[in-house]
């Protein structure tokens, strides 16, 4: 596979400030197709790179500048993560595998960025690891579980194919008591294979988010075990929701 980067600069790239330091790479899934995702990300400067299904890589925001890709986010007490990271959007879904072309392209892109910024494998993270939510009526504390974006990038077999060693063994902000856990299912997915399969009792949110029913259409209907917050997540209580 020939590694190619095409420029699709955001009109906001030139206006963005330089990033004070680069500690992390954050991997996202678009949860939609290339055309719509690229248009939105380009318009708002929401990632440095996008990797299409074909393996084409698009450069959107200057890698030395801040891209607004992580939203409300924290890792190791640092917040927002936009100020410390490079954001890569990968076209696809958090629970579906990448194409062979995407694996090849993303692996090479990560290899180059790791070398340039001396980023350790442990600091290449899924968006869902660093995102957090504000207190709301379902979860009285600031909490993990706001998103499942990029969830597949925590899987050991996926990381191996990307040339990465295992991800973090624990959530530093949960362990330090800075954040509670709202989505125990997600927490277990991210950290179970590292020996942290259970949420620390003293830090768990009062009510764990129940497992979403299948199929997906049913997951959008309020019913027993499916409340408004579990559907709307970060959009809950917004006037547009």
Label every model-predicted segment.
Residues 1-120:
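Active-site-adjacent loop/helix surface patches within enzyme catalytic domains
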Residues 33, 120, 154, 238-240:
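Alpha-helix initiation/capping motif
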Residues 206-239:
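Primarily a LysM-type cell-wall glycan-binding module
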Residues 1, 93-210:
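Basic/polar, cationic surfaces and motifs that engage anionic cell-wall
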Residues 26, 50, 87-89, 125, ...:
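Soluble periplasmic/extracytoplasmic beta-strand elements of cell-envelope proteins
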